[in-house]
Curated annotation (Swiss-Prot):
InterPro entries the UniProt entry points to: Flavoprotein-like_sf, RNR_NrdI
Species this protein is from: Streptococcus pyogenes serotype M6 (strain ATCC BAA-946 / MGAS10394)
Signal peptide: none
Xref: NCBIfam families: PRK02551.1
Taxonomy, superkingdom: Bacteria
Name of the molecule in the record: Putative NrdI-like protein
GO annotation, biological process: protein modification process
Similarity comment: Belongs to the NrdI family.
Recorded GO MF terms: FMN binding
Amino acid sequence: MPQITLVFISLSGNTLSFVKRLSLYLADNYDYHVKQINIKDLKHETFPVKEEFVAILPTYLEGGNGVDSGEVEILTTPLGEFIAAHGNAQRCLGIIGSGNKNFNHQYCLTAKQYAKRFGFPLLGDFELRGTPDDISRLAQLIMEASSRHSSNDTQTLPNS
């Protein structure tokens, strides 16, 4: 059974709820085993992730509007530290952002910042706890990213 790892941080429970439902969907519909790493549980510890993973990040920013001010991440920085440590960013297939669309420009801004900072794609987004449509859409995008990564690995193998 193939495996995918979801590395995330959940502060209010919305992201955790989404990750649990996404994990079940990936298992039931794609026969994937999903390993979950909630950064909140690690208490600022880091370690090398050996396998490919997808990061899932809620948006927590300091006030403002995300244009003139309010672009500074708060509360979720341990996920960025984890991705930056031990070369983990190189094994990240991409990031999924979550947020609240009421915050306009700030919606999923932190995930966009991580994609730019680490050089991996923003795979998609969902609002609050996510809907069943979000689960199926993002599961498909994860599978596509995993497939692209696998085919790139195959192309870089030396000819025998």
